[in-house]
C-alpha cells in the first residue's frame, strides 16, 4: 500500500503513471491479466486531472486526482472498486458513484476500500465479512461506497489492513474497526478481556492513546501503529515477526516504541507492510524492522545460528533480536517518498525509484522473480531529466508517477550510472526461502499474488 500524498504535493498534469508486478485481476490497469516484470507506462491516463496519490490492495488499485476524482481497477469480487457491480475491471475507470464527492485519500485493504472525502467523512465498500466496512448491520459486501455514519468526528487520515481499518480524527483520536486482530488476540492472550476496538465492527476509539495527539495511523495484517504530533510511535496487535519491537507476542493496547530505537530522534513518518514497518525521523533517517525473510527490511541479517544468544522469557519470545529492533537503512537517508506493499517496498530518493523485498511477481521491477535484498534502483523507469514523484504499492504490485521532460528519453535498456550508497548486488537465495509457505498465515482460495497485503503509511507535518 502507499502513503497518501497531501494536496500540496500534487503532481503536475504532465506526469505519467507506470505500473508493474502482480496482475492476475488486471490491477495494473493495462487491459490484460499477465504479470509484468518491468514498469509499463499507462497511455492517456487521467488527462483531465493531476495525480495526487496512488495505492493498491489485495488485487485492486486506486488513483486519486487533484480534483478529487477516484480511478480504480482490478479485482472487484466483493465490490471493492465501488462501481456498483462485481466484475473485474482491467483499465482504470472513474468511480462514478463518487462524482460530486471529492476524495482526499484512499486506503485499499485486502478486499475492501476506505475513502476519505475532502470534508472529512469516511466511506467504505467491498467485503464486510469481518466488519471492516465499519457498518455492523450492513450486508456482507457493499458494491457502492457508503458513509460510516457512526464516525461523526472529522477525519484527517484513514488506513486499511488485511481485515481491519483505522481513522485518525482532527482532534487526534484514533478509531479502529474490523475483527482482523481479534482472533490472534484471543489465541495469544487467553483469559484476557480484549479491548472493544479489537473486536468492534463499527469505529471504536483506540484506548491507551488518551495522553497523546495522533496525526495518522497505519495498518498491517495483524497490527496497527499510530504517530503522534510529538514524534512518538505507538504500536499494538500481533508481534509474531518482531514488528512491534516488543517482547510480547501480542499487545492488546498501544505501546510506545522508545525513542532510543530511533537514535533519540522524533519520528515524522511511518509505513507498514503486512509484517514489517518503516519509519523516517526528523533528520531524514529511515529505519526498518519486522519480518525479513523476503528482504523486506532492505538489509541482510545474520542467520539465527550466527547470532549471539539473548536471554528472553520463553513465554514472551518473538523472532530474533536483529529484525525486531528498528535499524537505520543508510542508503535511504533523505528519501522523499516510501511505500510498503505486503512484503516489498518502494522509495523515492534523489528523484529515483528504488525497490526491495518480495519479488515473486516482479513487483520490484528488475525483470526477475528473485527477491531483492537491498534497495536497488528500478532501472527501467525513465532516467534523468525525468523525475520520480510518487510511488504506491498493492499487495504484490507497484505504481509510480514520473514527471517526463518535454522530449522524453526512450526507456529501453536504461543504465543507472550512480548506484545508491550501500547498494550491494542482490544474489538469489530462494533455496533458503519457500515462497509458497506463509507460516500458517495463508488465506484459502486466494491466488499467489493475493497472499500478502500491505498496510500503507502516513507522514506528519506537525512534528516539531
Curated annotation (Swiss-Prot):
Pfam families named among the record's database cross-references: WD40_RLD (PF25390)
Swiss-Prot/TrEMBL RCC1 repeat ranges: 15-67, 68-119, 120-171, 172-230, 231-283, 284-351, 352-402
Entries under InterPro entries matching the protein: RCC1/BLIP-II (IPR009091), Reg_chr_condens (IPR000408), Ub_ligase/GEF_domain (IPR051210)
Phosphoserine: residues bearing it: 429
Keyword Metal-binding annotated: no
Subcellular location(s) of the protein: Cytoplasm; Nucleus
Keywords: Cytoplasm, Guanine-nucleotide releasing factor, Nucleus, Phosphoprotein, Repeat
Keyword Phosphoprotein: yes
UniProt superkingdom: Eukaryota
GO molecular function, a single term: guanyl-nucleotide exchange factor activity
Segments for region (Disordered): 422-464
PROSITE patterns: RCC1_2, RCC1_3
Subunit comment: Interacts with SEC5. The interaction occurs only in the presence of magnesium or manganese and is stimulated by dCTP or GTP.
Protein's UniProt name: Secretion-regulating guanine nucleotide exchange factor
Species in which this protein is naturally found: Mus musculus (Mouse)
Organism lineage: Eukaryota, Metazoa, Chordata, Craniata, Vertebrata
Gene from which this protein is expressed: Sergef
Amino acid at each position: 500500500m502507499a502513503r497518501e500524498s497531501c494536496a500540496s504535493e500534487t503532481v503536475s498534469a504532465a506526469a505519467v503513471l507506470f505500473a508493474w508486478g502482480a496482475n492476475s485481476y488486471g490491477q495494473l490497469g493495462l487491459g490484460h491479466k499477465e504479470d509484468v516484470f518491468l514498469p509499463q507506462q499507462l497511455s492517456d491516463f487521467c488527462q483531465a486531472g493531476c495525480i495526487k496519490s496512488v495505492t493498491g490492495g489485495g488485487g485492486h488499485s486506486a488513483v486519486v486526482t487533484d480534483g478529487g476524482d477516484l480511478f480504480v481497477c482490478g479485482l472487484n469480487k466483493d465490490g471493492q472498486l465501488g462501481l456498483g457491480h462485481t466484475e473485474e475491471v482491467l483499465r482504470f475507470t472513474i468511480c462514478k458513484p463518487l462524482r460530486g464527492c471529492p476524495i482526499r485519500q484512499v486506503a485499499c485493504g485486502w478486499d475492501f476500500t476506505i475513502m476519505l472525502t475532502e470534508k472529512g467523512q469516511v466511506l467504505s465498500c467491498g467485503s464486510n465479512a469481518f466488519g471492516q466496512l465499519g457498518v455492523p448491520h450492513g450486508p456482507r459486501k457493499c458494491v457502492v461506497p457508503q458513509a460510516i455514519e457512526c464516525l461523526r468526528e472529522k477525519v484527517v487520515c484513514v488506513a486499511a489492513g488485511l481485515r481491519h481499518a483505522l481513522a485518525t480524527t482532527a482532534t487526534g483520536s484514533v478509531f479502529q474497526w474490523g475483527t482482523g486482530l481479534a482472533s490472534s488476540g484471543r489465541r495469544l492472550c487467553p483469559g484476557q478481556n480484549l479491548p472493544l476496538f479489537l473486536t468492534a465492527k463499527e469505529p471504536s476509539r483506540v484506548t491507551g492513546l488518551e495522553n497523546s495527539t495522533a496525526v495518522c495511523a497505519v495498518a498491517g495484517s495483524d497490527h496497527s501503529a499510530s504517530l503522534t504530533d510529538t514524534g512518538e510511535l505507538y504500536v499494538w496487535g500481533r508481534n509474531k515477526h518482531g514488528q512491534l519491537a516488543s517482547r510480547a507476542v501480542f499487545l492488546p493496547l498501544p505501546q510506545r516504541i522508545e525513542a532510543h530505537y530511533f537514535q533519540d530522534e522524533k519520528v515524522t513518518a511511518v509505513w507498514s507492510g503486512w509484517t514489517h514497518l518503516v519509519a523516517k525521523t526528523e533528520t531524514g533517517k529511515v529505519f526498518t524492522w519486522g519480518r525479513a525473510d523476503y528482504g523486506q527490511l532492505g538489509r541482510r541479517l545474520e542467520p539465527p545460528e550466527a547470532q549471539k544468544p539473548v536471554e528472553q522469557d520463553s513465554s514472551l519470545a518473538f523472532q530474533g533480536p536483529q529484525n525486531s529492533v528498528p535499524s537505520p537503512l543508510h542508503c535511504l537517508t533523505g528519501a522523499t517518498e516510501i511505500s510498503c506493499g505486503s512484503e516489498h517496498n518502494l522509495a523515492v530518493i534523489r528523484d529515483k525509484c528504488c525497490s526491495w523485498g518480495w519479488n515473486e511477481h516482479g513487483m520490484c521491477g528488475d525483470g526477475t522473480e528473485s527477491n531483492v535484498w537491498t534497495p536497488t534502483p528500478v532501472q527501467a523507469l525513465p532516467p534523468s531529466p525525468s523525475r520520480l514523484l510518487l510511488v504506491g504499492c498493492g499487495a504484490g504490485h507497484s505504481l509510480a508517477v514520473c514527471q517526463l521532460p518535454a522530449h522524453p528519453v526512450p526507456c529501453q535498456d536504461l543504465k543507472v550510472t550512480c548506484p545508491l550508497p550501500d547498494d550491494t548486488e542482490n544474489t538469489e537465495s530462494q533455496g533458503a526461502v519457500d515462497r509458497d509457505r506463509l507460516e500458517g498465515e495463508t488465506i484459502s482460495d486466494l491466488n499467489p499474488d493475493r497472499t500478502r497485503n500491505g498496510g500503507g503509511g502516513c507522514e506528519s507535518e506537525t512534528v516539531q
